[in-house]
Amino acid sequence: MTLFSSISSISNPMTSSKSSISSFGSGTSMGSNSIACGGCGGSGGILGLGLGLGLGLDLTGGSRSRGACGGNGGNRGNGNGGMGGGKSPCCGGCCCGI
């Protein structure tokens, strides 16, 4: 049981770490996603940095997108994750529409 707790503790921080790393390096990765969604531009890359990583970092990505979009990213990683279900991106003028 103790071992399990330790593993959980280690797992948790790792996720947080990944979130941070993703937020930083995802901007570049998001470039492809942004372009695929219609090329939002620089801001799109920053907004979608966490969104594209919807694989579980939707928490970070959602927060970022909502903050930058003005709180209209209710569907952070709802379907595509990459673009918050096509609703968050519409805030920055780059509607994914996927």
Curated annotation (Swiss-Prot):
Organism: Dictyostelium discoideum (Social amoeba)
Family that this chain belongs to: Belongs to the hssA/B family.
GO biological process: sorocarp development
Coiled coil regions, renumbered to chain: none
Region (Disordered): 1-29
Name used for this protein in its record: HssA/B-like protein 36
InterPro entries: HssA/B-like_chaperone, HssA/B-related
